Regions:
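C-terminal active-site/capping subdomain that shapes the small-molecule cofactor and substrate pocket
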Residues: 214-316
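N-terminal Rossmann-like NAD(P) cofactor-binding subdomain of oxidoreductases
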Residues: 1-174, 264, 275-277, 312
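Short, well-ordered turn and helix-capping elements at secondary-structure junctions
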Residues: 33, 96, 200-202, 287
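A residue-level signal for beta-strand positions that form part of recognition/binding surfaces
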Residues: 26, 89, 137, 195, ...
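Active-site-lining helix/loop region of Rossmann-like oxidoreductase modules
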Residues: 7-14, 40, 124, 128-253
Length: 316
């Protein structure tokens, strides 16, 4: 039986990973007390015993854990500390045909950011196949449930909801300095050479994410259609069980004309939609920011690293 230690099990992502793994009989979860977590020797000992360690920590704390002396185990880091570090494998199995194998053999895997996952998967095939130039200037808009901000933001929103239900915070843009911490990985793994203009927002609901990427026809290297874009993206992910690429202008996926950012909650699924007409095209990704965008992705990577069925413990 494989032994797994979650370093930072009390946070939003750590709790959900623990919840998923506790239900399995092929994994033993190792634990230490909160007090012992602050004692380097105790933490080193449990890490040394583990077959894999999942870091659910702030960036600096994640770097410190990896740097502990005498640790010869495999790491999955759910923070953004190592996502563009060439010494770490990017934990997005669907990125290309070789990424799963890279994860299987890796000792250091960096779990992708939720926004980056939703952006990279629809955009990378278009750049890889020459439909979009790598120097394209793209814009990205997205909305996520407030759980994406961790325990502090969850508490703020739920307090507001209970104390002032008549004054709900609706969709609220943030990161208006245009320096969101997911941007470096969005650039690196999409194949772009320049940062997209990324404007995320938080919605007044717990979880679920929707990212939209508008594309004008003049951005493309040659004349394209929604059908051609669909074929390009669908061909990339036709064997990926977690990714569904919907046919162009799939109105059956809408709820009375609306796209629901919560439609994939509780799953490890990501849906890609293509809407538009000849001169304007809109790509939309929908995923659970706590599932495929965080805890589900970590479990998927863990399964690959430990030689287990890739989707063990996951709902697709």
């Amino acid at each position: 039986m494989n032994k797994v230690f979650i370093d930072g099990h009390a946070g939003t992502t750590g709790l959900l990973i623990r919840e998923r793994l506790e239900q399995r009989d092929d994994i033993e979860l190792l634990g230490i007390t909160d007090a012992d977590r602050k004692i380097a020797k105790v933490k080193q000992a449990v890490m040394h015993e583990a077959d894999a360690v999942i870091l659910c920590l702030p960036d600096d704390a994640a770097r410190e854990s990896v740097a502990l002396e005498g640790i010869n185990t495999r790491f999955i880091d759910a923070s953004s500390a190592h996502r563009t570090n060439p010494a770490w494998v990017y934990g997005l199995p669907e990125l290309n045909g070789m990424q799963s194998e890279a994860i299987i053999s890796a000792d250091r895997v960096s779990n992708p950011g939720c926004w980056a996952t939703a952006f990279v998967l629809p955009v990378a095939p278009l750049i890889d196949n020459g439909l979009l130039p790598s120097n394209s200037h793209l814009s990205v808009n997205g909305v996520s449930g407030y759980s994406g901000g961790g325990r502090g933001l969850i508490e703020r929103y739920e307090t507001q909801q209970s104390e002032q239900p008549q004054k709900l915070w609706h969709s609220r843009p943030y990161s208006l300095g245009l320096t969101h911490k997911h941007l470096p990985e969005m650039v690196k793994y999409s194949g772009l050479t320049t940062e997209p203009l990324f404007q995320p927002s938080v919605g007044h609901y717990h979880q679920g994410m929707l990212v939209s990427i508008p594309l004008f026809a003049e951005l493309f290297t040659n004349e394209v259609s929604t059908d051609k874009i669909f074929q390009c993206i669908a061909d990339r992910y036709d064997s990926e069980p977690c990714i569904t690429v919907h046919p162009p202008n799939d109105e059956a996926a809408l709820d009375q004309g609306f796209m629901d950012p919560q439609s994939n909650n509780g799953t490890n699924r990501l849906d890609i939609y293509i809407f538009g007409k000849h001169s304007q095209i809109l790509l939309i990704s929908v995923l659970d920011n706590l599932g495929k965008g965080a805890s589900g992705a970590a479990v998927q990577n863990l399964n690959l690293m430990l030689g287990m069925p890739e989707l063990a413990g996951l709902k697709t």
